């Protein structure tokens, strides 16, 4: 688990991802020991991540995590990397905060915690974020964290995305 000031970023193993796939919210609550909002499972790319784990179980720490508000013991979003860093040390981060928990700094806190963890791992040199050009909140977040746009790409699911990169470690001056 990765912890920050308010969040625990709990890795979703194959058992938890299987519960997400079938939409078993009570089972997830028992497995994770937290309150799982009914809309949360729909935000998790569970089938894709299950396939990645089946192919390489060592990917687990780099994949999807529940974003848990520690005080409330409630899931407020999902975050993680798309997989281990590539051969150039680039790891792509992803995040989604549930609508009722937005505008509280959870995404920023999660990305900073993941970046610190990735840097400490020694395997990642660069953090990548791909953002839809219409997602103003996410664009504002990555820019505020010092990410720089390096291009764009066409995602088969999400359409056009702007690609941003930020070297590790993060050093944010006030």
Regions found by a protein language model. Name each.
Residues 101, 105-113:
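Conserved acetyl-CoA pyrophosphate-binding loop and the N-cap/start of the following alpha-helix
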Residues 127-131:
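Conserved hydrophobic beta-strand within the GNAT/NAT acetyltransferase core sheet
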Residues 1-92, 96-100, 117, 121, ...:
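GNAT-family acyltransferases
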Residues 108, 133-151:
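Conserved active-site alpha-helix within GNAT-family acetyltransferase domains
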Residues 111-114, 118, 126:
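A short beta-strand-loop micro-motif that forms or neighbors metal/cofactor-
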């Amino acid at each position: 688990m990765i912890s920050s000031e308010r969040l625990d970023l709990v890795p979703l193993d194959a058992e938890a991802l299987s519960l997400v796939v079938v939409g078993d919210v009570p089972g997830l609550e028992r497995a994770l020991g937290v309150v799982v909002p009914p809309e949360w499972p729909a935000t998790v790319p569970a089938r894709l991540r299950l396939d990645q784990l089946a192919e390489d179980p060592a990917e687990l720490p780099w994949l999807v995590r529940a974003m848990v508000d520690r005080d409330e013991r409630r899931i407020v979003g999902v975050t993680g990397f798309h997989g281990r860093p590539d051969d150039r040390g680039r790891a792509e981060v992803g995040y989604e905060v549930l609508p009722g928990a937005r505008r509280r700094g959870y995404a920023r806190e999660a990305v900073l915690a993941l970046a610190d963890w990735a840097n400490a791992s020694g395997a990642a040199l660069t953090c990548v974020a791909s953002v839809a050009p219409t997602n103003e909140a996410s664009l504002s977040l990555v820019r505020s964290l010092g990410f720089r746009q390096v291009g764009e790409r066409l995602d088969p699911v999400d359409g056009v995305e702007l690609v941003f990169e930020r070297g590790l470690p993060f050093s944010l001056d006030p």
